[in-house]
Amino acid sequence: MTTTDRAGLGRQLQMIRGLHWGYGSNGDPYPMLLCGHDDDPQRRYRSMRESGVRRSRTETWVVADHATARQVLDDPAFTRATGRTPEWMRAAGAPPAEWAQPFRDVHAASWEGEVPDVGELAESFAGLLPGAGARLDLVGDFAWQVPVQGMTAVLGAAGVLRGAAWDARVSLDAQLSPQQLAVTEAAVAALPADPALRALFAGAEMTANTVVDAVLAVSAEPGLAERIADDPAAAQRTVAEVLRLHPALHLERRTATAEVRLGEHVIGEGEEVVVVVAAANRDPEVFAEPDRLDVDRPDADRALSAHRGHPGRLEELVTALATAALRAAAKALPGLTPSGPVVRRRRSPVLRGTNRCPVEL
């Protein structure tokens, strides 16, 4: 990040957020989505999916239908590199290099390590949930402990994740959606220099969110927890279906490294394309009853991931950790009930991060 003056950085963050709000208030759904105020963005996702390939006033091309989303994710001409600076950002004196680049570097990073065995992970997670009658915050007391403990096998140092990764958890959101100044500064300070470790930091928040979404989905589906307890393979199918409905990354930013045609539109070299993965994975042209959780879905293999086409094994690691957590918690889930509202993190259009989820066992 080249801006060292706090006042200057704060002005840039506020300027970009204000322009997002202004564009969105005048009918552009993409910048309004970036503001991160929706409790449930599905209505906006449906509208974007039905609009086809569309160029936002932010100069970003937005893709939300399954066929075009898959085309972008599969085309090696689209990468996570940083593209050209939009003219409106340049005119506002707030190029991404001065407020978003550290977070775009996190998004572009990859991890190539060894994924731990799911069965061994599940055994190690067995004591994370307290006994019956306990009240807890599903986020802090369980979901975040999964990557902290699970990635210890990868890093050999849980303390690294316990502190710094929590501060950096906004990184994937901050590459597109300006955060508050103090949050931005804390996140930048927490980011490690090693790209692989940066990827793991991003994976920690992705894992925690997936665990929360999976636990809530299973506890709301009669008989599913018992099925997972009896059949470990059901946990993997459940996590896959939860990730279809609630992807680890709802939005995926790619940059065209060459001129590419998408439908009737030509995307120029250096232009940015955002794939609304969460909309594509509920495309009724592809999935029967797309809004319904169905762990035996015959078309499950058609679900898209934001990591598709990007190198590394981070997605495998996130899936393994979430699957192991579900297996470890399965016997306790039939007795789990919400004891308060789920609090989603604002300014979180990419991750749809969860801040707090009070439950009782």
Swiss-Prot record:
Signal peptide location: none
Single GO biological process annotation from the record:
antibiotic biosynthetic process
Q: Which InterPro entries match?
A: Cyt_P450, Cyt_P450_sf
Question: Pathway membership of this protein?
Answer: Antibiotic biosynthesis; erythromycin biosynthesis
Q: Which GO terms describe its molecular function?
A: heme binding; iron ion binding; monooxygenase activity; oxidoreductase activity, acting on paired donors, with incorporation or reduction of molecular oxygen
Keywords per UniProt? Antibiotic biosynthesis
Q: How does it assemble?
A: Heterotetramer composed of EryCII and EryCIII.
Role this protein plays: Involved in the erythromycin biosynthesis pathway. Acts by forming a complex and stabilizing the desosaminyl transferase EryCIII.
Q: Which family does the entry's similarity section mention?
A: Belongs to the cytochrome P450 family.
The name of this protein is Cytochrome P450 family protein EryCII
- Species of origin reads Saccharopolyspora erythraea (strain ATCC 11635 / DSM 40517 / JCM 4748 / NBRC 13426 / NCIMB 8594 / NRRL 2338)
Taxonomic classification = Bacteria, Bacillati, Actinomycetota, Actinomycetes, Pseudonocardiales
As recorded in Swiss-Prot or TrEMBL, the protein's gene is named eryCII
